[in-house]
């Protein structure tokens, strides 16, 4: 047990990771040594930043809390604090059920946590953070909360209304990160396309991305978690005109059947969805689309599911994730619909959909053999350097593997490669 050391454990999404990184910087500014995501307690104090999005995430968070409670009982830890989405939503219940935790905090109560440690929040470090990612890329969160009211989603209940960060503050953070060696930015929010509506009374995502693209030293910008309804089409021009805005869009579509889109309260139709995809591919040639789909939402019939499969076959997404509906208390779906689709049927549909996507992904990967791409090197792993193209986001997308015995490559640098082989997800390449 190291004195004056705090372990930060982050669960859930990249937005949570940014929160942890900002907290880490505050703790370091207050004199602590901070470790991140260690397998076992190293310091006197641990802070677990939880996720509470769906059932599996809640279970993972609870298990991690209990694991650290055990470590505390064994004398390996003096203090245990819990924050984040799960804690925000179930603070009172958790405090009663798990008294071994010294204190539970909401998602945004950093000041309180620091005060309990006898420290103070330092506003001069507000846009600074301690990166936990490789030094060449960072996640850039442009807003908090969500203004949408999708039937199944508890995020607005947990995080509250959409709050855009001021544009100047974001640009200052980008410049600071570039000065520290960051070249690649993953732009994230619960819902990107709403950015600016609350603060500037209109959608400002295209303007923001263009301003980030114009910052010297920004080499790649990638956009995550867009919403299909009222998509700001000015963004197409920005993507076309700026080479450092990756031809990549992560847009959660959830379903295609009008029956399900209505039940999900998505405020977009099947026809509008197809039209938007067509516009993406027409206006931004070569764009790679990532989406997330949901199966098993209350009311999903076999016909709805077949329609979803046909959609996946027809559109042939470059990247796709999917998950099964999980009832979340307090949501519209939990109040108004019966969760009548069995776990077995949900899992069967999920497996079927992902098997279909795996086949499509494999076919799309094969078309890249013989082509040349610019890649950034993330790490060395065994006999390979691991890199990504502009079409691949860290953690969730395919990677490019380059034999390490070819030549010495620098982590965080760009190289031109030629694809020599492919499997269902990853590509193999040689340096040009």
PLM region descriptions:
Residues 111, 148, 193, 258-259, ...:
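Glycine-centered loop/turn positions within well-structured domains
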Residues 170, 187, 223, 251, ...:
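Conserved, mostly hydrophobic/aromatic
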Residues 6, 45-46, 138, 185, ...:
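Conserved beta-strand core positions
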Residues 333-432:
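Terminal RNA-binding accessory module
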Residues 189, 225, 253-255, 291-295, ...:
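Active-site proximal loops enriched in glycine and acidic residues that flank catalytic Cys/His/Asp
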Residues 79-84, 89, 94, 179-303, ...:
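Conserved SAM/AdoMet-binding glycine-rich loop
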Residues 1-195, 234, 249, 271-282, ...:
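Proteins enriched for Cys/Gly/acidic motifs involved in redox and nucleic-acid/cofactor modification
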């Amino acid at each position: 047990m190291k004195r004056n050391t705090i372990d930060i454990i982050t669960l859930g999404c990249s937005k949570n990771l940014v929160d942890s990184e900002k907290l880490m910087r505050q703790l370091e500014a207050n004199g602590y040594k901070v470790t991140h995501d260690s397998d076992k307690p190293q310091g006197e104090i641990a802070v677990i930043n939880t996720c509470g999005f769906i059932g599996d995430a809640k279970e993972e968070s609870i298990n991690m809390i209990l694991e650290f409670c055990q470590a505390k009982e064994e004398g390996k830890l003096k203090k245990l604090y819990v924050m984040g989405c799960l804690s925000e939503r179930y603070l009172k219940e958790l405090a009663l059920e798990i008294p071994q935790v010294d204190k539970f905090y909401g998602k945004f109560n950093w000041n309180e946590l620091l005060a309990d440690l006898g420290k103070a929040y330092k506003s001069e470090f507000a846009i600074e953070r301690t990166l936990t990612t490789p030094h060449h890329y960072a996640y850039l969160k442009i807003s908090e909360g969500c203004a949408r009211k999708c039937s199944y989603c508890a995020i607005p209940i947990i995080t509250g209304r959409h709050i855009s960060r001021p544009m100047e503050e974001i640009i200052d953070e980008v410049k600071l990160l570039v000065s520290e060696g960051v070249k690649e930015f993953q732009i994230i929010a619960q819902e990107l396309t709403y950015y600016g509506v609350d603060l500037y009374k209109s959608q400002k995502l295209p303007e923001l991305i263009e301003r980030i693209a114009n910052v010297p030293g920004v080499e790649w910008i990638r956009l995550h978690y867009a919403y299909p309804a009222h998509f700001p089409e000015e963004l197409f021009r920005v993507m076309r005109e700026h080479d450092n805005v990756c031809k990549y869009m992560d847009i959660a579509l959830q379903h295609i059947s009008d029956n399900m889109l209505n039940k999900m309260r998505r405020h977009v139709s099947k026809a509008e969805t197809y039209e938007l995809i067509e516009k993406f591919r027409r206006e931004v040639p070569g764009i790679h689309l990532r989406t997330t789909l949901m199966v098993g939402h209350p009311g999903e019939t076999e016909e709805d599911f077949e329609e979803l499969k046909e959609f996946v076959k027809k559109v042939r997404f470059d990247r796709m994730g999917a998950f099964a509906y999980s009832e979340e208390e307090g949501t519209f779906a939990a109040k108004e619909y019966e969760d009548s689709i069995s776990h077995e049927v949900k899992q069967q549909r999920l497996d079927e959909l992902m098997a279909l996507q795996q086949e499509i992904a494999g076919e799309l990967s094969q078309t890249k053999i013989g082509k040349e791409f610019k890649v950034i090197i993330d790490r060395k792993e065994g006999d390979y350097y691991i890199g990504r193209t502009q079409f691949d986001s860290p953690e969730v997308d395919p990677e490019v593997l380059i034999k390490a015995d070819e030549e010495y490559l620098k982590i965080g640098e760009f190289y031109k490669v030629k694809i020599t082989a492919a499997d269902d997800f990853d590509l193999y390449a040689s340096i040009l």
